[in-house]
């Protein structure tokens, strides 16, 4: 069974969308706590890494709103395709650039005025980069939802969350 078939094959799209949306929400909610547990358990004497991760994750989640800019609801409800996917993609590209520019600005400000270490600077940028992938993939998930295949979008998103958790556990 190939990946395309695994993502798209279902007997009931509505039920599959509902179930996978619920699974995706649960996995999404587990990302930060599980990664934080891994960080604190890997070196319990040095909790600085956990603090840096917490700040980075909080900043990245705030900036994710800028990267997504609330277009998903608008895009998925555009069933008559008044705007093309290329237009949504282009707008998302601009909002993602703004997101990373804001992240860089935040890190520079923190380095100058708050004495952020280079470690904190780069961890914040890396976590923001991780959220950049989420913001960018959201426009593709919006397209899937627009085409009536929310189940494909949520399966993809759930897989990405699992890879995030696994990669942090490995590193």
Q: Which sequence ranges carry the predicted segments?
A:
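N-terminal membrane topogenesis motif
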Residues: 1-31, 80-86, 118-120, 151
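Signature of the first transmembrane helix
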Residues: 9-69, 100, 126, 130, ...
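Helix-loop interface residues and adjacent transmembrane-helix termini in multi-pass membrane transporters
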Residues: 42-47, 82, 146-147
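Membrane-interface alpha-helices at helix entry/exit sites of multi-pass transporters
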Residues: 51-52, 82-92
């Amino acid at each position: 069974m190939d990946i395309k078939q695994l993502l798209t094959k279902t007997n009931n799209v509505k039920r599959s969308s509902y179930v996978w949306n619920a699974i995706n929400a649960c996995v999404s909610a587990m990302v930060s706590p599980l990664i934080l547990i891994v960080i604190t358990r890997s070196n319990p004497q040095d909790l600085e890494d956990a603090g840096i991760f917490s700040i980075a994750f909080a900043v990245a989640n705030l900036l994710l709103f800028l990267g997504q800019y609330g277009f998903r609801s608008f895009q998925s409800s555009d069933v008559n395709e008044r705007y093309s996917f290329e237009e949504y993609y282009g707008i998302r590209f601009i909002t993602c650039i703004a997101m990373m520019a804001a992240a860089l600005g935040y890190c520079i400000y923190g380095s100058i005025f708050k004495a952020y270490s280079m470690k904190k600077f780069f961890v914040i940028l890396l976590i923001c980069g991780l959220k950049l992938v989420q913001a960018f993939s959201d426009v593709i998930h919006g397209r899937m939802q627009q085409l009536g295949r929310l189940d494909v979008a949520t399966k993809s998103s759930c897989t990405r969350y699992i890879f995030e958790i696994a990669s942090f556990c490995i590193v």
